[in-house]
Amino acid sequence: NVMRIYDSSNIRNIGILGHSGSGKSNMVEGLEFTAGLASRITGNENDTKITSSLSLHAIEYQGTKYNFVDIPGYSDFFGEVESGLAAVDGAIIIVDGTTDLTVGTETALELTDSRNIPRFIFVNKIDNEKADYEKILSQLREKYGKRIAPFHVAWGKGDGFRGHINVVDMFAREFDKGKNECKTV
């Protein structure tokens, strides 16, 4: 394989942060699947794997190289968190939609805020029967105010989950769990 050389304007270093068990590693695996780097998604939300060290996942998409840094969620690995944050230009904070607002989420938001790292929040596991998107959104807004502004909202809840609605561009994506694919509606 020939290694491609990228201009620095076409490289993005993005940290994946969140509370332990929120689905950070599964999110990266899903991104690899979407980019065609994996033939299937093997992660299971019931898996109890713990990320204990930084891992780098390079994904090329539409001419840009995205270096996703999977950062541990346990406070025991704070040195790894510090190292990961020093290397990123932006962050995706993964929030578990089946729980209340967690310490790991709050820590990720505070750490990225203190370093002026641009970030967005991804509410994960919203297709789970225990998920409550509105509750977690309300908790985030209560704690962080108007800085929490959804671009996408869940379409349905629990077993009635159908997909997400893009409230900026006004379209919906419906998820077919049986085929593991989305379609714009």
PLM regions: where:
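P-loop NTPase catalytic nucleotide-binding module
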Residues: N1-S22, I41, D96-V185
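P-loop NTPase switch module centered on the Walker A-proximal segment
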Residues: V2-L101, Y144, P150
